[in-house]
From Swiss-Prot:
SUPFAM superfamilies: P-loop containing nucleoside triphosphate hydrolases (SSF52540). Substrate binds at residues 42-47. It comes from Cereibacter sphaeroides (strain KD131 / KCTC 12085) (Rhodobacter sphaeroides). It holds the Pfam family IPPT. One of its GO terms (molecular function) is ATP binding. InterPro entries: Dimethylallyltransferase, IPT, P-loop_NTPase. The lineage of its organism: Bacteria, Pseudomonadati, Pseudomonadota, Alphaproteobacteria, Rhodobacterales. PANTHER family: TRNA DIMETHYLALLYLTRANSFERASE (PTHR11088:SF60). The record marks 127, 149 as: Interaction with substrate tRNA. This is tRNA dimethylallyltransferase. HAMAP family: IPP_trans. Its cofactor is Mg(2+). It is an enzyme of class 2 (transferase). Its EC number is 2.5.1.75.
Amino acid sequence: MAEDAQGRPAPTSPFFVTIPSKLLPQLPDIPSDRPVLIAGPTASGKSALAVRLVEDGGGVVVNADALQVYDCWRILSARPSAAEEAALPHRLYGHVGARQTYSAGHWLKEVAAVLAEGLRPVIVGGTGLYFSALTEGLAEIPHTPPEVRAEADARLAEAGLARMVAELDAETAARIDLQNPARVQRAWEVLRATGRGLARWQAETAPPLLPLSDATALVIRPDPTWLAQRIDSRFNLMMADGALEEVRAALPGWDPTLPSARAIGAPELVAHLRGEIPLDEAVAAAKLASRQYAKRQRTWFRNRMRLWHEIRLP
């Protein structure tokens, strides 16, 4: 089995670089010097499209996926292979340690440094918050104290998501994804630490780093049934490429409260490796989690990216 630079299994399946056949004909005219943003749900072919655009027009592929930043996840996050990263300029992939915290603010500062390099950026990913921070601006919210983070972790574990949602201010609750535990906990922490709701802080947002009017913004809108089939097929290939071994390598010191532990499929495979569920159940649960994640992504894109150029698939 192939390995990456850190000795971990590296994805080899051609599925990871497949562009759906009906995608390219839907592209608008894209000047070679204009920044490109590509958003889409998991397994929709967006990363392969970014590579094609850089191959054809030059520039650098920039990651906008909150899990592809972590060095422990190449296969499970569908990060580009080591060979792909070497073939073209790539930025912000696999550069963060598994135990480090990494926020949209961290990402935005690093993107600013990439833009300063002067290469045309093709920014691609499925984390909607990164794109909104980039094109709409990001509020300067004070850092959450460790004791508040610990209190939030305990409260979510003991009282559950619904209770935490009920304790949010109404303005924030109306704006965030209430099905996303990470987003809800972050909003709860801000309110607890500062006495002001997240929505109030966001109202004091600085100007955007890259306004939408200065970029070609593409959002992939796949048919849910078609996408579900691709998700299931891709996870099968991930397993064949060594996803279980990748999770096994991350098992020592596993901490489910870390942001890196939110990799889709990781908790399910950890449960199997700990003897809690059989492998077939873990795989089925991981596929379900991936489909549910894709649904949340589609909802975000539909509600927040109405001015982006749509690409319908298949």
